[in-house]
Regions:
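The conserved cystathionine-beta-synthase
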Residues: 171-180
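Cytosolic catalytic regions of ATP/NTP-dependent phosphoryl-transfer enzymes
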Residues: 16-161, 167, 180-191
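Juxtamembrane helix-loop transition segments at the membrane interface in multi-pass membrane proteins
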Residues: 1-15, 38-41
């Protein structure tokens, strides 16, 4: 306890420290844990030569139609300010179980935003290699897609990829040192 106090650590219950000394695996969520939690859209990869809509206007209207505050949505909102010009007639909010969200707009079809492998039903191999390269480099890639169908919580039969949005979140300056400490202490690290 005295050693920890010297390192400006408050010990409220000693048994917690004893339990922590037996930890041999630490599971971490990358976003906001080893990153700074300052996600931004760093690149836009067009996926079609003839998009069905102006990307800025579509994603801006999408942001304006949904009320969400997760890190990805906030980063998209910074890059594509909410415009709300298009009239939304149906919304499917994001859920971590579904991994996508959508807004159906009057006279414009549905804009879908989510995980490429989910929106494309496992056919993400159809995407250009640059998408997989960005994912392999640790970036989050979000697919913007379009469907002529009205969407109410179930993926439509036809989803047309429009663009891949590459999001980056800077690594915390002390992350390397922290992770190295746990490795030296024989604690397995798992990024979930």
């Amino acid at each position: 306890v005295i050693k920890l106090a010297r390192k400006k650590t408050l010990v409220q219950e000693l048994f917690c420290i004893e339990n922590l000394s037996r930890v041999d695996m630490l599971c971490l969520d990358k976003t906001g844990t080893i990153t700074q939690g300052k996600m931004t859209v760093s690149d836009i990869l067009p996926l079609t030569a003839q998009p069905p809509f102006d990307l800025e206007e579509a994603v801006g209207s999408f942001i304006g139609a949904l009320d969400d505050n997760n890190a990805t949505f906030l980063a998209l909102g910074e890059r594509f300010p909410a415009r709300g010009r298009w009239r939304a007639v149906c919304r499917t909010p994001f859920s971590s179980a579904r991994k996508w969200s959508s807004v159906t707009f009057e006279g414009r079809g549905t804009v879908l935003v989510g995980a490429p492998e989910i929106l494309l039903r496992g056919r993400s191999g159809l995407l250009p290699p640059a998408v997989a390269e960005r994912e392999a480099a640790g970036c989050r890639v979000v697919l913007v897609a379009h469907s002529e169908e009205r969407v109410e919580g179930v993926l439509p039969g036809t989803v047309r990829p429009v663009a891949a949005l590459v999001l980056e979140d800077p690594i915390r300056p002390d992350a390397r040192e922290t992770l190295a400490f746990f490795t030296r202490e024989d604690v397995q690290l798992k990024i979930i």
